């Protein structure tokens, strides 16, 4: 069981709190279950834990779902995602789940109502719940058709009592809060694997690890390329210079094979004119232009997160 939850004492009137961390986790997966970056024994995840009253549950759940949909939509994965309402198996309560049937029925009815109110189209997964409560899993299929969970939002009805977490309501009565456990992008390694699959390695410019590569035609152009590259780097772009003594055709082919979004070819004419000659990996030659003009093109693509 994986659980990272920090608890702390609060004033009794404090009835909503949220805690979060980005951490490295370890899970002893069977060797036959491991698969590339999709299922690994060591992974990184950003988690949030929201401690709240029952009447806050729906609004907070909605915010968690909106956050996950925004993140997945921004990176281009949401369109292929499906939603699964993961429930307990009442026939197998003692081996996997904690809590009473009444607690589970209540938690699942609350979640069902929330999903209905939010108009979420989902399937039901029996025996897929966490040991402490039901959850909404955002699922994604890999290129082989196998479905994995990208993001999960869990309603926890049990751990607050175990950790001695209570709040005092408006009537002065001691009550147990709910806890929502949520992620926004899920396991980084798995999400990265699906991004690589989805884009066939050609990640959009705004998320590409290398956005621009300068390709000097001759050694005479290397210093000019380095000066121009430094200007882009200073603006926050990820830029390299190919200083190898190779023919320009090979440099272009290598950059294409490595799926570099923009290649800036620089020859003697560019040095004399103070220009660069950009190529896009999909659109080809864009024609000679000043570095400022190219920067404007790059800024538009990156700032608007265009899928090119």
Language-model regions: role of each:
Residues 39-101, 126, 206-214, 233-234, ...:
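Conserved alpha/beta enzyme-core scaffolds, especially Rossmann-like or related mixed alpha/beta domains
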Residues 73-153:
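Metal-assisted phosphate- and nucleotidyl-transfer catalytic regions
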Residues 229-297:
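C-terminal structured "cap/appendage" subdomains that terminate the fold
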Residues 26-38, 61-79, 107-111, 115, ...:
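Structured alpha-helical segments in the cores of large, soluble enzyme domains
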Residues 1-11, 15:
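Single conserved hydrophobic/aromatic residue that forms the stacking wall/gate
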Residues 23-55, 81-88, 163-178:
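Residues forming anionic-ligand binding surfaces in small-molecule and nucleic-acid pockets
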Residues 17, 21, 25-31, 126-202:
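A translation/RNA-centric and nucleic-acid-associated enzymatic feature enriched
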Residues 199-253:
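Generic long, charged, amphipathic alpha-helical segments
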């Amino acid at each position: 069981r994986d659980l990272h939850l920090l608890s702390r004492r609060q004033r009794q009137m404090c009835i909503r709190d949220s805690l979060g961390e980005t951490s490295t986790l370890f899970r002893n997966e069977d060797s036959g279950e491991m698969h590339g970056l999709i299922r690994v024994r060591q992974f990184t995840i950003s988690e949030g834990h929201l401690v709240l009253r029952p009447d806050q549950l729906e609004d907070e759940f909605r915010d968690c779902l909106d956050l996950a949909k925004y993140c997945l939509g921004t990176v281009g994965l949401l369109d292929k995602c499906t939603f699964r309402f993961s429930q307990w198996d009442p026939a197998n309560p003692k081996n996997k789940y904690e809590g009473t049937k009444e607690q589970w029925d209540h938690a699942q009815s609350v979640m069902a109502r929330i999903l209905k109110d939010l108009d979420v189209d989902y399937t039901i997964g029996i025996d897929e719940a966490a040991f402490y409560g039901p959850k909404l899993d955002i699922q994604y299929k890999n290129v082989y058709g196998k479905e994995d969970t990208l993001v999960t939002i869990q309603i926890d009805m049990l751990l607050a009592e175990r950790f001695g977490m209570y709040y005092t309501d408006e009537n002065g009565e001691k009550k147990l809060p709910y806890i929502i456990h949520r992620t926004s992008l899920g396991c980084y390694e798995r999400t990265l694997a699906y991004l690589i699959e989805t884009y066939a390695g050609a990640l959009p410019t705004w998320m590409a690890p290398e956005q621009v590569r300068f390709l000097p035609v001759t050694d005479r152009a290397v210093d000019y390329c380095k000066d121009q590259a430094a200007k882009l780097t200073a603006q926050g772009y990820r830029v390299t210079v190919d200083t190898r003594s190779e023919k320009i055709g090979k440099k272009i082919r290598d950059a294409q094979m490595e799926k570099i979004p923009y290649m800036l070819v620089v020859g003697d004419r560019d040095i004399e004119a103070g220009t660069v000659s950009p190529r896009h990996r999909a659109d080809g030659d864009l024609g000679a232009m000043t570095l400022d003009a190219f920067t404007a093109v790059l800024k538009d693509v990156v700032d608007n997160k265009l899928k090119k």
